């Protein structure tokens, strides 16, 4: 399937499985009359494969060591990208950032690394399913930077176009999205 055909098919899946209308309170605290819940798309076999394919194509030339983001939205996505990268003989490992470190065990903020493995000096991409203001992704960025990593890109599947671009620019973080909310609202 061509990239444009993959993109169109994924948009159809998102529209069917993950987009809705109706008043909702977003993670940012804002109210909205539409929403995206990408988990049904990320956990659908075809949706996961297409998200991984399109995201991997975006990352392929970035010389990325790791991909991850804030739990819960980044977990299925990072896992799918890691799996596809292995199949493409260009492995990119995955991790996720806890919203709050566990109060028992190793008390880690960043999960998925093997014993003795570190993000120090590694090139990382932060992924997110849906971005509104950028606040959640910036929390993940801060935790990963504390681990000594370099953030090369913040990549979201859907940008709600409500300030994230400006927030990432102000933080000096490159930002891209696979889709803009307006692509689903104007159909």
From Swiss-Prot:
Listed GO biological process terms: 'de novo' UMP biosynthetic process; pyrimidine nucleobase biosynthetic process
Q: Which residues bind orotate?
A: 132, 160
Its cofactor is: Mg(2+)
MF term (GO), any: orotate phosphoribosyltransferase activity
- UniProt keyword annotation of Disulfide bond present: no
The alphabetical list of record keywords is: Glycosyltransferase, Magnesium, Pyrimidine biosynthesis, Transferase
Residues crossing the lipid bilayer are: none
Pfam families, per this entry?
Pribosyltran
Q: Which residues form a coiled coil?
A: none
Q: Part of which pathway?
A: Pyrimidine metabolism; UMP biosynthesis via de novo pathway; UMP from orotate: step 1/2
What is the catalytic activity of this protein? orotidine 5'-phosphate + diphosphate = orotate + 5-phospho-alpha-D-ribose 1-diphosphate
- Positions with a binding annotation for 5-phospho-alpha-D-ribose 1-diphosphate: 98-99, 102, 104, 128-136
Classification via InterPro entries: OPRT (IPR023031), Or_phspho_trans_dom (IPR004467), PRibTrfase_dom (IPR000836), PRTase-like (IPR029057)
Provide the assembly information. Answer: Homodimer.
Family stated for the protein in its record: Belongs to the purine/pyrimidine phosphoribosyltransferase family. PyrE subfamily.
> What does the UniProt function comment say about this protein?
Catalyzes the transfer of a ribosyl phosphate group from 5-phosphoribose 1-diphosphate to orotate, leading to the formation of orotidine monophosphate (OMP).
- The protein depicted here goes by the name Orotate phosphoribosyltransferase
Species of origin reads Rhodopseudomonas palustris (strain TIE-1)
The upper taxonomy is:
Bacteria, Pseudomonadati, Pseudomonadota, Alphaproteobacteria, Hyphomicrobiales
């Amino acid at each position: 399937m061509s990239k444009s055909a993959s993109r169109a098919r994924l948009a159809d899946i998102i529209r069917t499985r993950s987009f809705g209308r109706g008043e909702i309170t977003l993670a940012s605290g804002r109210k909205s009359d539409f929403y995206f819940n990408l988990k049904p798309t990320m956990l659908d076999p075809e949706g996961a494969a297409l998200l991984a394919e399109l995201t991997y194509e975006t990352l392929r030339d970035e010389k990325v060591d790791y991909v991850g983001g804030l739990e819960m939205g980044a977990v299925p996505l990072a896992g799918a990208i890691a799996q596809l990268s292995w199949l493409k003989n260009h492995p990119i490992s995955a991790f996720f950032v806890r919203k709050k470190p566990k109060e028992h065990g190793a008390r880690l903020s960043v999960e998925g690394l093997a014993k003795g493995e570190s993000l120090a000096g590694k090139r990382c991409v932060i992924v997110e399913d849906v971005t509104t203001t950028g606040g959640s992704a910036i929390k993940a960025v801060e935790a990963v930077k504390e681990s000594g990593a370099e953030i090369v890109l913040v990549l979201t599947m859907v940008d709600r176009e409500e300030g994230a671009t400006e927030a990432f620019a102000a933080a000096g973080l490159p930002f891209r999205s696979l889709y803009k909310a307006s692509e689903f609202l104007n159909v």
